[in-house]
């Protein structure tokens, strides 16, 4: 006869899973964050800054995974259970009402520079720059050279002779190099809460999706809107945003057509009469004076009088423009001397 032995689960673990499940169910946005490399003082500072916007709880990875799966089952939400695939390192549960993109931005803004530790993987290329270290001659000169940093004594101080990448992104930083970088005051990493994944409304977001260049995104949206507007306007597509401009364009075109074809309407009668009068006066100006009556002569005279000041103004404008060009040319010539 087979005897089944029921595994004993510590009561505190059961309570912890229950607490984590309550946290997961309490907010629409659930994130898994990594806080392994965050020193205790900085972690406390971050907690204090974001306390009003998020709820954060550290726990064992196995308990977080169990809580996610049980909560997903109870909520009949299999997508939520997929968050368990992202639990690693020093994971913690974070819940909030903020959307994933705002959450990512909040956590990034609350990161602070820190020295790299020996054994850590470089998150980026780490470079030392040419120049004085401000340190007097001594054993540190040998330490710099031992990790491949070209250094010498210049003006009584240890100086780095050239810019150099001492470790590339993805490489492990040796303890010796980490100590040298720390003495140089180089803090190449930012420590804080790193998002591993965020769940909202049936979608899981990863950091590569959440990392958005806001200025570029806004410029792209504005360009897309302008292009869509132009396309709709030029194809006469009656979108809500374009319709007032299409109506205005149609009115202007219809009015111009009406005037051109002498089709009289309430709106165009005045323009058609003005055009006809202008054409009549233009024709009359070609005739000899004896063929014209006094009324036509008076009208022609008034046209000539009103045209004269306009011509004078045009000449004056051309003269000013010419003088401005000469000034600009002179200024450009002087600029070449300097």
From Swiss-Prot:
Keywords: Ribonucleoprotein, Ribosomal protein, RNA-binding, rRNA-binding
Region (Disordered): 303-338
Annotated GO MF terms: large ribosomal subunit rRNA binding; structural constituent of ribosome
Family annotation (SUPFAM superfamilies): Ribosomal protein L10-like
UniProt similarity note: Belongs to the universal ribosomal protein uL10 family.
Function comment: Forms part of the ribosomal stalk, playing a central role in the interaction of the ribosome with GTP-bound translation factors.
Record-given protein name: Large ribosomal subunit protein uL10
